[in-house]
């Protein structure tokens, strides 16, 4: 389901007519022709513990989204569920309040780690996983940790399994190999190679607001998402809660593009 959503948006960005542009601006609050800055990382895949340099790229919002969705599609195409589980660490890096659970074993099924014994989250990833894992190893090494809340979500639409997975994949850092060689600067600029995700964060990131409520009675993350959109802030492209809105499509909306 999430791959169908991403393919739909990939096609919309390839078409990019008046309808697609208007829908994009309505969802994100920012026009596609605006210029934004985007941070990515230069990584040394031969020495993954020693090299991690940030770079900043200026592009139009449209070019940023087009390349981002292409990379997200590649990641999603690699994700799979394997019926033969592999035991992984009990330690939960997303939730400090959760210690080891006595007699509890945690298993990974393909790329998905079953942590449904906790309702602290729907899902999470380690953002820097793409800094130490090249694209040809995504199928073997990338992990999506699944919490209990994920299973109560509908398949597609708002706050769904599909949009949640798009949210999580957007967290992975966009990376380039330290020794990458390009035929020309034009080739480098135009490349939409399958390296990492988008590098989004859960904003505001100065605290844990999973259960915090604003003065208006809304979850802090959701209120902040609305504020960014209404102020037409370019930070909507840094915030996974805003980013996932573009992927809140239902089944019929995805079918339309295949006619």
Predicted regions and their residues:
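Walker B catalytic acidic pair
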Residues: 168
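Predominantly extracellular/secreted Zn2+-dependent metalloproteases
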Residues: 1-162, 172-259
